[in-house]
Amino acid sequence: MNKKEKIRIIRLLLKQYEKDKNILNSLNQANLYPSINYEDYYQTSSSSKEDYLLHRIQLKQELTKRIIFIEKSQSIIGDEYYHIILEDYFYEHKHWWKTYCSRATYYRRQEAAINAFFDYVTSIL
């Protein structure tokens, strides 16, 4: 697999990570017990309410697993490589590295970060 394909996969994973964090945040802030409209209350069955709450719990668990998967990569690949991955493909800042290192060092570390992150992803999946 070449570098462009790896970068595309990393970008997709990080975009999904961002979506998952936003959805989980909105689920955590949502009111689980909204005000009751008694007409709706008597028309709906209790099983549909239970299904709704069960679905929310399962969705939260699934989102949490996916978020932890990406955040765990920081401890596996190291802070420096994780920082490179986030700056390049999550925040998409173009010239953030110019204050830290030379061009050759940046590209060498970027290549190593891509390979380390991709190896982590493929080892889990």
Region spans (language model):
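Short amphipathic alpha helix immediately N-terminal
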Residues: I76-E92
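Helix-turn-helix DNA-binding module
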Residues: Y91-T105
